[in-house]
Design a protein with these regions (language model features):
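Amide-donor transfer/coupling interface in amidating biosynthetic enzymes
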Residues: 1-20, 45-160
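Catalytic nucleophile loop
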Residues: 13-41
Length: 160
């Protein structure tokens, strides 16, 4: 949807400039990266030679299909308390070149980027997987949402 692309590519830099919390999920990590100047792999299988079956699971989406490894000391390790997380996966695109203002914080076993955060603020982070399908039975996925809610409340309180 070209209009959605335009809207999201405009609103993300505005939110970051206002120091608003941003939590990108799936397409959100991709749009965040492009909005900040990075590039995408348009099709993992044809461009990287990695079978997309690892990244395009069938239902149930709450079932983990691969491991994401978080960098030690990353915001994701601080939020979840772990350096490895079992995740779902439903995408055929991914980050190619990360934006210079983003830090790569997590990878799938095949090297696909699965987690990033802003270098200059702890309020901007994103994942390629779908924690919303995992959070009812995975404490680590739920911690991502809990952290985002806390950031949002802090932001709201700062504006009072």
């Amino acid at each position: 949807d070209p209009q959605r692309d335009i809207f999201e590519l405009l609103i993300i830099p505005m939110a970051i400039a206002r120091n608003m919390p941003v939590f990108g999920i799936c397409r959100g990590i991709q749009v965040l990266n492009v909005a900040m100047g990075g590039t995408l792999i348009q099709d993992i299988e044809s461009q990287k030679g990695i079978p997309t079956k690892m990244h395009q699971q069938e239902p149930p989406y709450g079932a983990p299909v691969h491991t994401v490894r978080f960098e030690r000391g990353s915001i994701f390790e601080r939020i979840t308390g772990v350096t490895e997380m079992q995740t779902n996966s439903m995408h055929h695109q991914s980050i190619k070149e990360p934006a210079s203002r983003l830090r790569v914080d997590g990878y799938a076993e095949d090297g696909i980027i699965e987690a990033v955060s802003a270098k200059d603020t702890d309020r901007v982070f994103a994942v390629q997987f779908h924690p919303e399908y995992l959070s009812d039975h995975d404490v680590y996925a739920q911690r991502l949402f809990d952290h985002f809610v806390k950031l949002s409340r802090d932001y709201q309180n700062e504006k009072k």
